Each structure stands twice: as structure tokens, then as C-alpha cells.
Amino acid sequence: MNSFMSLVRTATIALLLIAFLQNANAVKNLQSIVAYHGAVATDDGRCSAIGTNVLRQGGNAIDASVAAALCLGVVSPASSGIGGGAFTMIKLANGTEVAYDSRETAPLSATEDMYGDNPERKKKGSLSVGVPGEVAGLYTAWTQHGKLPWKQLVEPAEKLAAEGFKISKYLYMQMNATRSDILADKGLSELFVSNGELKKPGAICRNPKLADTLSQIAEYGPKAFYNGTVGFNLVSDIQKAGGIITLKDLQNYNVKVKEPLSTEILGYRLLGMPPPSSGGPAMMLILNILAQYGIPSGVSGPLGVHRLVEALKHAFAVRMNLGDPDFVPEVTNVVADMLSPKFAQDLKSKINDEKTFDPKYYGGKWGQIKDHGTSHLSIIDSERNAVSMTSTINGYFGAIMLSPSTGIVLNNEMDDFSIPTKSGGDPDVPPPAPANFIRPGKRPLSSMTPTIVLKDGKVKAALGASGGMYIIAGTTQVYLNHFFLNMDPLSSVVAPRIYHQLIPNKASYENWTTVYSDHFEIPEEIRLVLEKKGQVLTPIAGGTISQLIVEQSDGKSGGISKLVAVSDPRKGGFPSGY
């Protein structure tokens, strides 16, 4: 039993849950670090180190985010990569605040009824692939705000793909969960299978085709991907497999540069991602509801958890009115409501401290989309520029399809769209949301919630999480733990979490032992109180993986603030800094 296990064994109730920190010092060497010049928190320590190396070389947070994100796509290809997309939130020391939407788009030939009577084709295979945006997004942010040469930022990932990387325990778990699909795909089999069996943790994995692709991108930038050899080969592979993406789809792809959502809550200003992210507005709505109870007492203990669950249910009722604002103009009004303190006040008045209600009480008209996967990174540099980026290919290994000629694992982002269903279904299941129906060039709704926290205009934190539909609740709880409940950064991330998506009407709570032998569980005393209030609870083995960096003033360092960076132990990652 390692020291982290003993840490997790003794739990004390805070809001969410637990602080689990009896023996934190032994863990802090890995999961939590203190740095003064710059810090990088990703869900894989190799990529955190690559990001820090970029900072040491004179790069800024934007440079480091490019190198770290590309690294994650190589060593953690079940979660993200250049075959997917991303949302990136940036706050610069000069005052600039900007959001980059490089979410995947529906192909130009896509239609809302393209899956007919076979919705499984929306989940995996060539028809589930959206037009990738990550390369364009990274390059656009770097062009506008980066310092180091582009090629220098791509080379570490290229080297990893060429020379090989060790399969982590977490990646092996993802491989095992999709074993039959990997064995059925030629490209994935070449990467992850040896002698008819999945490669084991610690085995070396090489992706020479991806190394070649990254070499092209390093030399020619996104042109290679969107209008060059890489793009031509990628489209050819997709079409051979029956997909509809064309070179014109790639050529037409564009990054949306947006103004972040912004709201003041209890003295802090939050920057969040606007739609097609539902995460930014939903997190702000939840926090605005909970802030009215008073902190920390109003959001502490079992009652605080009940109030959180109820706020989540209200937020998810509103969430499915959101969609791509370029196609659904009324989304702007929905977001205005979600950021309104008066709207939050009205919802808070509907929360009953003694009981919960069925989904209809919360007013949700539409069914929920269950997005998956993702990877999150947080970076703050010596100038206190901050980047919070969540990237994704959606489900484990996306479309379960690796392009043989490029080495790219392709996303299954089309599964994040809603599709019409025939009438006559379960009367308790709401219909799919028209705001999220497929249209050519449209971006599907997402739960990704990259967040930056400011105080008096200065960066105080960068945070976010991976975990698909659970991301909103997971990111919100980490924020609550630190900023509402005054838990230290490591405790804020380690505390077990609870989730609710309104439909089904169940609260999912962590009760699992990770592949690293760490156990996470909502305490029984909290569960008993919730059940007495009518909450239906179900245990889950998983949830969200959070990366948090907090800026703290430190009287011992001559006025230089320190950075406390935490990578979630649930995925075995660790932060890096100097």
C-alpha cells in the first residue's frame, strides 16, 4: 500500500466531500509542487515536463501549451490528439483575455438524419468523425501570442512518437476497455497489439507515421494538415473506410476567436468558455446559485452536497437549450440568463433543503447528450500569463480508428450531436434538443470547462478537467473546494466527487480504486443524509481528472508569488515547474 493509499484512507468531511489529507507530504512530491517561475499541470508527467522545458527555454504559457498538448496526443492517444479539437482559455499579463474555439465541425455533407436507423454509426467508425481542429487552434493561439519558433514546440512530440513511449497503466486500462475494437482496427492494432495481445503497461509504443505527420506540421504548420500531404492522406483513409470528410472540409476549417464569458462571484472574476461549450455558462450558474447560501457554512457538509446536486440539476435543465451560436442565435439569450444573478436567485428559491424532485420540476425540455473523454492542461508562466486548455477526441480512442497513412487517431465528435428520434418512446425521456441537431459546418455542444480565475485583474488560478459529461460538476467542485471551502490545492483535487446530469435522475458518486491503487469514495455519512432527502445514489468507477494551478502570495519569497500546481492522482499524472 503506497503513501497515497494511506492518505486516502482517512477522510474528513468538507463540502465535497472529503479532504483526505492525513499523509499529504509524501504525495506532494508527485501530485503537488510549488514553483515560482512557471508551472505546468497535465494528466501525464512526461507532458508536464515538456511544457516546463519550453518555459525554461524562454517560452511563455502559450508556447508551453502547444508542446504539452501535442505530447498528450502522442502518449495518451485514447483521450486527445491532433485528430480532435480543443477549447483554449488565455489570460495574458498585459490584460488580454481570449478564448479559442477549435472544436470539431460536422462535414459539409452531414445531415441531421444521416445515421438513419443505425445510431451506432454516430458512436464509432468513419461516419462518427468530425473535421479536426486542434492543429489549427494551437497554431492560431501561437501565431497571436507565442514567442518560440513553432518547429521547436512540435519537435518533442515528434521525437516521442518516433523513439517510442511507455504505455501507462491508465492508457492500458483504456486499451483494455476497447480491446475488441482495437483488435478490429488495422491502424490501432499495429500500434497497440503484439503477437495477438494488447501490449502491457511499461511496453514501448512507437508511432512512426505520426512522427512523420508531426514532422510535416513542424515544417509547414497547419497547411500540411488542412491543405497538404497530411490532409490528403487523412481524407483518403477516412473515405476508404466509408466516411464523408473531404479535402474541402479541411480547407474550410477555421478557428473561432472569441471573448470569454466573464462573471464576478464573491470577489473573484471567472473566465469561461462560451458556447458551443456548455461548461462555461453552467459552472457560472451553479456557483451563482451556491454563493447565495454563504460560504463556507452554506456549502459545507451533507447539506452543502445536497445543495450542489440540486444546483447541478437546475443547470443541466437549462444546458440543453445551448448549441453552436453561429447556427442557433437564441443561444445568446440562454447564456445571458445563465450568467444572471437574478436568474440564479430564482433557481435557488426552488431548491428545497429537505428533499429533491423528479426531472420535470427543474423544467428541462430536452434529453442530455453524454459526451466522453478529453484531456485538460493548466499552465501559468513567470509573467503570470495563464492557459487553460481542454482537448478531446471524445470517447476512448475516438472513432476507434487510426488513420494508417498518418498515424492519427480520429475523433468521434459527431456523437456529441443530438439526432431526431421517432415519437412513441419513453414518456419520461425528453426528446433530443433541436439546438444541437447536425448541420454542415456546425460544432456540437460540449461539456469542456477550461476556466481561469482572476482577483483584481490578476491570475489566481487555472483549472479544468477531463471526463466528458462529468466535467462541469468536476471542475465546479474543485473550484468550490478551494475558493469557497478554503481547502488547499491538493485537497481540492483529491476530494471525492459527486455528479448529476438531471436525466437519469440519479446522483453518481465516486466509489472506486484507480489503476494506481488509490481509493476515492464519498463518505457513507454524506450518502445516508442524501438518501434521506430522496436522492437516488449510484456508485461509479471513474469521473473526472482535474488539473489545477493556484497563484499564492508568499511572504518568504521577497514578494514573488508562488504557484501551487496539482495533477489529479486518478490518472497518475504529475505537474512540473521551476
Curated annotation (Swiss-Prot):
Question: Could you tell me the EC number(s) of this protein?
Answer: 3.4.19.13, 2.3.2.2
Pathway stated in the Swiss-Prot or TrEMBL entry: Sulfur metabolism; glutathione metabolism
* The keyword Transferase is assigned to this record: yes
What are the UniProt keywords, alphabetically?
Answer: Acyltransferase, Apoplast, Glycoprotein, Hydrolase, Secreted, Signal, Transferase
Single Gene Ontology BP annotation: glutathione catabolic process
Q: What does the record say about tissue specificity?
A: Expressed in roots, immature trichomes and pollen. In developing siliques, specifically expressed in the embryo, endosperm, outer integument and a small portion of the funiculus.
- What are the transmembrane regions? none
Molecular functions (GO terms): glutathione gamma-glutamylcysteinyltransferase activity; glutathione hydrolase activity; leukotriene C4 gamma-glutamyl transferase activity
Record: residues binding L-glutamate? 103, 392, 394, 413, 416, 446-447, 467-468
> What does the record say about the knockout?
No visible phenotype under normal growth conditions.
Q: Name what induces it.
A: By glutathione.
Of the GO CC terms on this record, one is: plasma membrane
Q: Among its keywords, does the record have Ribosomal protein?
A: no
Q: What is this protein called?
A: Glutathione hydrolase 2
To which species is this protein native? Arabidopsis thaliana
Lineage, uppermost ranks: Eukaryota, Viridiplantae, Streptophyta, Embryophyta, Tracheophyta
